[in-house]
């Protein structure tokens, strides 16, 4: 069943999570005004899946069940699936800024791979167990929170060496009917308005850290789960032309001796497969982040065009404005092209699903992570200083100032002052507000820091092939000297014949 956004909001009423926000308990997540922008953003993924014009991108046939499911819950099987997912994420983020639910997709795809790997290595039954869970999630059209990033404590110490073991989620007890987990996940996207959490390890583990290599599904309102969250976006702020409607909450999620039955446990101490799960999720998620931030970039490009027009400028005549816009387009479409390439060159996994190309996915995410601030700078350049100097919206209706402001803050004659002010506040919201800083930081660190992506690129790039390519060119004489003799690759020889020891003077 494909739910609508209204259905999704209503479904949250069936849960009673323990949530704290701004120092108080939240009685009803669905009715909390400070969380409404986050619920609205996730809701976009539901409504768009029900629109006929978006059906190809937003829905897919699940190969293991034959059912039509939301793209955000689908297991990718082909390069086309990867490309459609990338385009779907861009689409929903064009509307919402960050639709958040694509994390569910990324975790499910990583689990599909890791559970099969664990079964093959250890004779476990995780994969069938996961498939049963997957089909249930798809049938109910749920949204899953990815509880992956642990609190970590002293980062110079491994999980098992921490003074406080609860800075990482770990297994404290194994029972005949399940496991008990304890610990803290520090950064959980959309935590209060998820249906369930997928608890996953955030790093590779050693045998000594086996208790921390745990993956399981936990309802958001399970006994022992506490969520301490922040508000989503800028709810209730009149100047927030975008993020008063759409935003994202993040939460610290504490697991205090939470019982998880075995049918919801997908790894329990298999540390090597925990590493597979972590790296697989990272690749899927970085691929999705490319689509998400391209959607955000589309908002900046559109707002930039409107600001230029309302300021009375013509990019065809004002080359510096045109150049700035082209640079913004180049950045957005440049990292998005890496996402397309990662889709086209995706590799089949032994589990039967497909994985985005690791190098292209990481290069694309690294580009957007390191260029998000350039995107904001270019948007500021074409907009001008008005976006941060504009009086608040209350002055738009103040009889003492309204007429004067409308007269002096108008730009082009055929564009009313209120339209110019509206787009200026939109641009401020996206690029020069607290929410703008949030977009910058999640772009930089979301899905892993730039250093993590650099390591993956270095680890997976075919450097040996590139080295051998040049060695073959040298062997073929492509880099021969002027005499036509090629340089030999034989160690210790600088030419084809080798160096000759000169005979002593006066000999012979």
Regions found by a protein language model. Name each.
Residues 184, 188-235:
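A short core secondary-structure module
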Residues 47-144, 196:
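Internal helix-loop-helix
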Residues 296-299, 306-374:
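Long, well-ordered mid-to-C-terminal structural blocks that present hydrophobic/aromatic surfaces
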Residues 23, 181-183, 255, 325:
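Buried hydrophobic positions in well-ordered alpha/beta secondary-structure cores of metabolic enzymes
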Residues 115-182:
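Gly/Pro-rich turn-and-neighbor structural signature
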Residues 1-46:
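N-terminal-proximal low-complexity accessory segments that begin disordered
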Residues 236-333:
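Glycine-rich beta->alpha junctions and the first turn(s) of the following alpha-helix
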Residues 359-494, 498:
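Alpha-helix capping/hinge segments and adjacent helical runs
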């Amino acid at each position: 069943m494909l739910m609508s956004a209204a259905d999704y909001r209503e479904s949250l009423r069936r849960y009673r999570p323990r949530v704290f926000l701004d120092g108080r308990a939240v009685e009803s997540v669905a009715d909390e005004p400070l969380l409404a922008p986050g619920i609205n953003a996730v809701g976009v993924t539901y409504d768009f899946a029900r629109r006929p014009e978006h059906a190809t991108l937003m829905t897919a046939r699940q190969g293991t069940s034959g059912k039509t499911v939301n793209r955000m819950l689908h297991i990718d099987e082909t390069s086309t699936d990867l490309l459609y997912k990338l385009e779907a994420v861009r689409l929903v983020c064009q509307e919402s800024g960050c639709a958040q639910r694509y994390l569910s997709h990324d975790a499910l795809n990583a689990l599909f791979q890791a559970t099969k790997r664990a079964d093959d290595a250890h004779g476990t039954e995780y994969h069938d167990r996961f498939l049963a869970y997957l089909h249930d999630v798809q049938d109910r059209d749920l949204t899953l929170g990815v509880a992956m990033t642990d609190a970590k404590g002293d980062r110079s110490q491994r999980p098992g060496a921490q003074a406080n073991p609860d800075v990482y989620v770990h297994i404290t007890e194994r029972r005949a009917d399940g496991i008990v987990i304890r610990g803290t996940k520090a950064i959980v996207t959309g935590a209060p308005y998820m249906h369930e959490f997928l608890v996953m390890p955030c790093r590779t583990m050693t045998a000594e850290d086996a208790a921390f290599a745990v993956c399981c599904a936990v309802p958001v309102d399970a006994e022992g789960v506490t969520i301490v969250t922040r508000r989503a976006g800028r709810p209730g702020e009149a100047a927030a032309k975008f993020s008063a409607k759409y935003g994202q909450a993040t939460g610290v999620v504490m697991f205090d001796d939470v019982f998880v039955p075995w049918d919801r446990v997908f790894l329990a101490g298999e540390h090597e497969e925990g590493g597979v799960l972590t790296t697989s999720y990272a690749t899927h998620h970085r691929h999705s982040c490319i689509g998400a931030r391209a959607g955000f970039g589309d908002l900046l490009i559109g707002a930039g065009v409107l600001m230029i027009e309302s300021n009375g400028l013509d990019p065809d005549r004002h080359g510096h404005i045109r150049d700035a816009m082209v640079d913004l387009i180049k950045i957005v479409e440049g990292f998005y092209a890496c996402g397309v390439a990662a889709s086209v060159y995706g590799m089949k996994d032994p589990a039967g699903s497909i994985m985005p190309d690791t190098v292209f996915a990481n290069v694309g995410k690294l580009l957007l992570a390191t260029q998000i601030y350039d995107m904001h700078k270019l948007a500021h350049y074409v907009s001008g200083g008005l976006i941060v100097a504009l009086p608040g919206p209350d002055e738009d209706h103040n009889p003492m100032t309204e007429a004067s402001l409308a007269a002096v803050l108008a730009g082009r004659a055929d564009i009313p002052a209120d339209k110019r002010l509206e787009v200026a506040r939109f641009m401020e919201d996206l690029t020069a507000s607290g929410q703008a800083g949030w977009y910058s930081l999640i772009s930089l660190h979301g899905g892993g820091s730039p250093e993590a992506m650099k390591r993956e690129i270095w680890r997976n790039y075919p450097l040996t092939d590139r080295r051998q390519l040049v060695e073959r060119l040298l062997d073929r004489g492509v880099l021969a000297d002027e005499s036509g003799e090629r340089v030999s690759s034989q160690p210790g020889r600088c030419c084809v014949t080798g160096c000759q020891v000169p005979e002593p003077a006066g000999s012979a």
